[in-house]
Amino acid sequence: MSASRFIKCVTVGDGAVGKTCLLISYTSNTFPTDYVPTVFDNFSANVVVNGSTVNLGLWDTAGQEDYNRLRPLSYRGADVFILAFSLISKASYENVSKKWIPELKHYAPGVPIILVGTKLDLRDDKQFFVDHPGAVPITTAQGEELRKLINAPAYIECSSKSQQNVKAVFDAAIRVVLQPPKQKKKKSKAQKACSIL
């Protein structure tokens, strides 16, 4: 077995969209019932991919505005970002392009982003929308449209509570680092030959 490769994966997104729950669900197969706003937490998980061990360093960030100046410190050295929004929060969906993409492009240009819609279990929960009349669900088509807009290689909807697609989120993050999508080559003007006289 070859030596393990370290991949730094940073989760970002609005406060209360489920970033910490996603990480806890992935690393411990449990769902936390209490909401505690994150300052910064790190997790580490060894994952075997195609016979090679990958040490996946998982960095959690706080989405609240109070941390706007502190949060980018965790971006340094990131190999991939998981950009999360809630499938039951139109504001968090809109902030992907309004707030998060500009921030990531400024502090970590060129780092791939996996777009993730969280709280999939609540999107189809009629009782949730009765209890929260202002909530607006985000459709899969809207998520896919946003993925194209921000040029993300993948969009995944998941539920940390039911574990649906949780592993798929991190598999996609690992895959985009180990096998980056081929960049379309720009047609360059004919290269000039160098002549030595």
Swiss-Prot record:
Matches recorded under SMART domains: RAB, RAS, RHO
Chief localisation class: cytoplasm
Residues in the signal sequence: none
Residues reported to bind GTP: 13-20, 60-64, 118-121
Propeptide span(s): 195-197
Pfam short name (any one): Ras
Residue numbers covered by motif Effector region: 35-43
A GO term, aspect molecular function: GTPase activity
Record-linked InterPro entries: P-loop_NTPase, Small_GTP-bd, Small_GTPase, Small_GTPase_Rho
Alphabetical GO biological process terms: small GTPase-mediated signal transduction
Keywords for the protein's UniProt record, in alphabetical order: Cytoplasm, GTP-binding, Lipoprotein, Membrane, Methylation, Nucleotide-binding, Prenylation
Cysteine methyl ester carried by residues: 194
Residues lipid-modified (S-geranylgeranyl cysteine): 194
SUPFAM superfamilies: P-loop containing nucleoside triphosphate hydrolases
Subcellular location: Cytoplasm; Membrane
Tissue expression profile of the protein: Expressed at the tip of pollen tubes.
GO CC field: cytoplasm; membrane
SS bonds (residue pairs): none
Domain of life: Eukaryota
Membrane topology: Peripheral membrane protein
CDD domains noted in UniProt: Rop_like
Family assignment from sequence similarity: Belongs to the small GTPase superfamily. Rho family.
PANTHER family attached to this UniProt entry: RHO FAMILY GTPASE (PTHR24072)
General function of this protein: Inactive GDP-bound Rho GTPases reside in the cytosol, are found in a complex with Rho GDP-dissociation inhibitors (Rho GDIs), and are released from the GDI protein in order to translocate to membranes upon activation. May be involved in cell polarity control during the actin-dependent tip growth of pollen tubes.
Protein name, per record: Rac-like GTP-binding protein RHO1
Naturally occurring in which organism (per UniProt): Pisum sativum
